Amino acid sequence: MVVIDGEHYPPVVEAALAGMAEDGHEVASAVLAGGVEKLPRGGVNAYGDVPVRAGADPRDVLDEALVELRPDAVLDLSDEPVLDYRRRHELAAVALYRGIPYEGTDFKFTPPSRPRLSDVPTLAIIGTGKRTGKTAVSGYAARHLDAHGYRPVVLAMGRGGPAEPELLRGDEVALEPRDLLALADAGRHAASDYVEDAMLARVPTVGCRRCGGGLAGGVSISNVAEGVELANGLPGGLLILEGSGSAIPPVHADVTGVVVPAGIREEYLAGYMGPYRMLLADFVLVTMCEEPFGSPSRSRQ
């Protein structure tokens, strides 16, 4: 599938699509991103054998086409001024949300892998970056879910996590200061998120590590899959997957919550890959609404 615009002369677009066909690509459809300056009156319904889809909002048009056709990839043949940086990222976010790569002349976005690994329902708590309150929200959710009989297990990944996934029975261990000092003396990260989750939520937790973080939240290396396998052996009824920074746990989640600090720059939420995280979200929780981090007016905005 391709994304085109009306800023290009139709013969140029048609020639580009013909060249793709000669190279062995099958173009199922073209989505018009906007622009009518160089289109004939009444628009264009097709370029050769490639039908053109258009509508009021190209994001909706693209989404409908992706769901219907399930292409292998989306190739962006548009350009400024029809697609500026923000609008292009919005279209890329739609494609990634549908699990389809989005690429252009000198870039390619690939949807982060999130396979189904858990034996129980999963809740992901992800954020727009570091210090957003993900661990506090995960602990809060775990406490309340545990109080209502759901027997949650929290899996937290971090840049300082253990080499092998570690189980901490927060429901059994006191985790007093001497316990934390013992962890530190043993060379372990006693302030890791999974330790904090176990101490504050009093539920079993699994600590994992990850390295690297992509624009869409993918991770380069992690032992989260092994951590989920460890969690599958516990008598839990729900697995909470806690993100790290802006990185997303590389595991399928049945429900996803996005933690957004009130003081976040608008561009981090509406631009770049912020729209992708918003598409993943079943709910959004705004944190740090008080001064000096935020304000009531900023939170409402």
What are these regions (language model features)?
Residues 96-107:
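N-terminal pre-Walker A segment at the start of P-loop NTPase domains
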